Amino acid sequence: MEIKVKTLTEKQIDIEIELTDTIERIKERIEEKEGIPPVHQRIVYTGKQLADDLTAKHYNLERGSVLHLVLALRGGCC
């Protein structure tokens, strides 16, 4: 099924997934399209950050669901 991923710049990416896909696999698909490594991605759906080891089914993702991609930036120390 197809879901949508929105970036902070409001760019929308269409991603084909299966309900059995983990969030980590979805991040890999985003990397294939956008070149952003999964380690730098945070995925938010209905206001919650999604855990890499859980599946699309666990989060009740449906065709047309919109996920939000947030970049995980490392903070520096003083």
Curated annotation (Swiss-Prot):
InterPro entries: Nedd8-like (IPR038738), Ubiquitin-like_dom (IPR000626), Ubiquitin-like_domsf (IPR029071), Ubiquitin_CS (IPR019954), Ubiquitin_dom (IPR019956), Ubiquitin_ubiquitin-like (IPR050158). Pfam families: ubiquitin. Residues 77-78 form a propeptide. It comes from the Eukaryota. The keyword tRNA-binding does not apply. Coiled coil: none annotated. Keywords: Isopeptide bond, Ubl conjugation pathway. CDD domains: Ubl_NEDD8. Detected in stems and flower buds, but not in leaves, mature flowers and seedlings. There is a cross-link at G76 (Glycyl lysine isopeptide (Gly-Lys) (interchain with K-? in acceptor proteins)). GO terms for molecular function: mRNA binding. Transmembrane segments: none annotated. SUPFAM superfamilies: Ubiquitin-like. Gene3D superfamilies: Phosphatidylinositol 3-kinase Catalytic Subunit, Chain A, domain 1. May function as a stable post-translational protein modifier. PANTHER family: UBIQUITIN. This is NEDD8-like protein RUB3. It comes from Arabidopsis thaliana (Mouse-ear cress).
